[in-house]
Amino acid sequence: MKVAVLGAAGGIGQALALLLKTQLPSGSELSLYDIAPVTPGVAVDLSHIPTAVKIKGFSGEDATPALEGADVVLISAGVARKPGMDRSDLFNVNAGIVKNLVQQVAKTCPKACIGIITNPVNTTVAIAAEVLKKAGVYDKNKLFGVTTLDIIRSNTFVAELKGKQPGEVEVPVIGGHSGVTILPLLSQVPGVSFTEQEVADLTKRIQNAGTEVVEAKAGGGSATLSMGQAAARFGLSLVRALQGEQGVIECAYVEGDGQYARFFSQPLLLGKNGVEERKSIGTLSAFEQNALEGMLDTLKKDIALGEEFVNK
């Protein structure tokens, strides 16, 4: 199994590469790519960690050598948020980066599963889909927006509030990956109940958690380490499913039946071909139903922005 990380010299990319080097199954290959000249050195640094995962790093304009034979491609390349910016302010720079890298994926490893981490995910996934479609290689079961950070944050905050072990809480999060489009389904967490005020406060905190980190880092960056962990969790789940493990379920932002929007984050059963089954979002509380209806315009606009970027 070969995993490629594009944007591997950045804050998320380095954290993700470290976690994959220590946690990928024995015999896996890990390939790091970034435009930054330091990237081969990041791979040498990680190569000293004693795990049975082969690692190589590549830099420069051409990602081809890193992508050859890749089964999974995780894309974290782009610029990070600064205080006062929201994820959509990143669009102008990151849209071009994602378009360029996905064009290279389409050419070199068109059958790979692709996980898009680069923000704004609501829009960059639509860009990736349109690029793959133009190249004639789009498979909607193999393109994912990685929203796992919303899930791990939800798990952490709920466990803190309710005095639970974080490992025993799993909150499904649906919708998109910014602001009001992030919808944690708190009504579906087994064995935990919330007051209306707790639901309102938790939902808001989960939606604004990225800003919490940006402000706390005071201009020094955005959420890189927790995002690295989230991306590793998703990437490792995908690898296990591709290798035939049964019953692997993760939420991610994918093209579905279009019931809510063309792309929508929901629980997915993963398998040997990527998405095996898009699972139902289940029964929502009145608060959740209302929040879902209220976010769809925003989500659809985010998606249209990405489609237009490629097709203009």
Swiss-Prot record:
The processes (GO biological process) annotated in the record are: malate metabolic process; tricarboxylic acid cycle
Q: What is its EC number?
A: 1.1.1.37
Q: Name one GO cellular component term.
A: cytoplasm
Q: Which residues make up the binding site for substrate?
A: R81, R87, N119, R153
**InterPro entries from the xrefs?**
L-lactate/malate_DH, Lactate/malate_DH_C, Lactate/malate_DH_N, Lactate_DH/Glyco_Ohase_4_C, Malate_DH_AS, Malate_DH_type1, Malate_DH_type1_bac, NAD(P)-bd_dom_sf
Gene Ontology molecular functions: L-malate dehydrogenase (NAD+) activity
Q: Which residues form the signal peptide?
A: none
Q: Which reaction does it catalyse?
A: (S)-malate + NAD(+) = oxaloacetate + NADH + H(+)
Q: Name one Pfam family in it.
A: Ldh_1_C
Q: Which UniProt keywords apply?
A: NAD, Oxidoreductase, Tricarboxylic acid cycle
Chain sites annotated for binding NAD(+): G7, A8, A9, G10, G11, I12, G13, D34, N94, I117, T118, N119, M227
The record's function comment reads:
Catalyzes the reversible oxidation of malate to oxaloacetate.
What is stated as this protein's family in its record?
A: Belongs to the LDH/MDH superfamily. MDH type 1 family.
- Write down the HAMAP family for this protein, in alphabetical order: Malate_dehydrog_1
Q: What is this protein called?
A: Malate dehydrogenase
Species name for this entry?
Answer: Escherichia coli O6:K15:H31 (strain 536 / UPEC)
Q: Which gene encodes it?
A: mdh
